[in-house]
């Protein structure tokens, strides 16, 4: 089966992902920061509303992926509470100052996830920020993680498709390779053909205006340039469109003899 994971930051978006045909969600907060650890309340609420897989982002702050000992301890605690809240998996990535995968500490967190409730682990796009993508894949394999999330080190999956294919060939079934980076209904079949991927990750966020009537024109509590009266959500139809395009991958492959 070709699997679809949708990145979400709310119960509303998680429900839309399931209704649209996704197999799992990556649950985060602060998607404007690239995704941070969600609250315990949000994890529990999402878990109670959907039946598909819930994979929780474990990232204590924005910025780089070099974490202090205090931050590492927080990540361990967050993995434990994600397990208690019913998560099926966790998502994280740790690098060294030199740009390599922090194998020792990543393996420790993988074991923590496995010990807590046999949760799966996705090593996220920290791998795309590493010094050497191919050797980093081998490092992640050594940690015991179940899959990596990658765009092939490029800004989009389309641009990084050649390297993604190389990673899939190098993985040799030892670890899953999930493709991300502007995956859309109009390009997913081409990405699948170019990479051989069978797992895809997408955000598909759409802007939705706030229903707030009164808006203080003299004060803004967000970052400069941000619109506090606009939020981004996942829409069921957008997920359904991507799922339908993905379902066409198998029929295309059978016709082409791939």
Residues covered by each model-derived region:
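Active-site-adjacent beta->alpha loops and helix N-cap segments on the catalytic face
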Residues: 12, 31-52, 70-73, 94-114, ...
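N-terminal amphipathic alpha-helix/helix-capping segment at the start of soluble metabolic enzymes
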Residues: 1-7, 11, 47-48, 216-219, ...
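Catalytic cores of alpha/beta
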Residues: 9-16, 66-78, 128-143, 167, ...
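Active-site pocket-lining/capping segments in soluble small-molecule metabolic enzymes
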Residues: 178, 197-238
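Hydrophobic faces of well-ordered beta-strands that scaffold small-molecule active sites
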Residues: 2-8, 25-27, 54-58, 90-92, ...
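Glycine-enriched alpha-helix->loop->beta-strand junction motifs that scaffold or abut catalytic
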Residues: 19-25, 49-53, 86-89, 114-118, ...
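N-terminal pre-domain/capping segments
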Residues: 1-25, 30-37
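Alpha-helix-loop-beta-strand connector modules within alpha/beta enzyme cores
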Residues: 35-62, 101-125, 161-185, 224-252
